[in-house]
């Protein structure tokens, strides 16, 4: 038998598997510390690796304990939770879409720019609007580029498996 293709998982194989918050943008009116606390409390309950990056980023900044209820994983999209009677979302574009949250042009442009840089964008929304965009980066391993080049030299096609959107995946692959 001759191997002619290989599939590599992005996180932890091609990248270091240690995502960190690289950028954050709060929409006007959402810079309030209360929103940071809400985001932190929701992400603290999530099991997704990107959530841990957000938790680490805000753990020193959280000043208020927030009571979160009705926490739900939305498979492949993110999480939803309630604080008081308000529903909050943390996740990807698909979660915004199914929740009927509109992503305005400025936030869309910023998200596309970050994704083009190879970052994964996490959206935080509440009250029917986007409150923040969080860019999470996972550094590509030093050895990955050479390993992929060596496989290509041997005539082996390399495919990357990722939960990221196509733009982020393309930036990492390039």
Question: Which residue stretches match the model-derived regions?
Answer:
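Cytosolic catalytic headpiece
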Residues: 1-174
């Amino acid at each position: 038998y001759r191997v002619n293709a290989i599939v590599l998982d992005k996180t932890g194989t091609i990248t270091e598997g240690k995502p960190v918050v690289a950028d954050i943008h709060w929409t006007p009116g959402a810079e309030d510390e209360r929103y940071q606390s809400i985001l932190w409390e929701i992400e603290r309950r999530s099991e997704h690796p990107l959530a841990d990056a957000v938790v680490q980023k805000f753990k020193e900044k959280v000043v208020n304990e927030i009571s979160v209820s009705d926490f739900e994983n939305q498979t492949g999209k993110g999480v939803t939770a309630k604080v008081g009677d308000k529903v909050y979302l943390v996740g990807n574009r698909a979660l915004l879409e199914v929740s009927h949250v509109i992503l305005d042009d400025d936030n869309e442009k910023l998200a596309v720019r970050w994704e083009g840089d190879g970052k994964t964008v996490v959206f935080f929304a509440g009250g029917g609007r986007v409150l923040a965009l969080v860019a999470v980066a996972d550094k590509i391993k030093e050895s990955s580029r050479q390993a992929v080049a060596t496989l290509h030299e041997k005539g082996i096609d390399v495919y990357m498996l990722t939960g990221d959107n196509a733009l982020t995946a393309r930036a990492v692959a390039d």
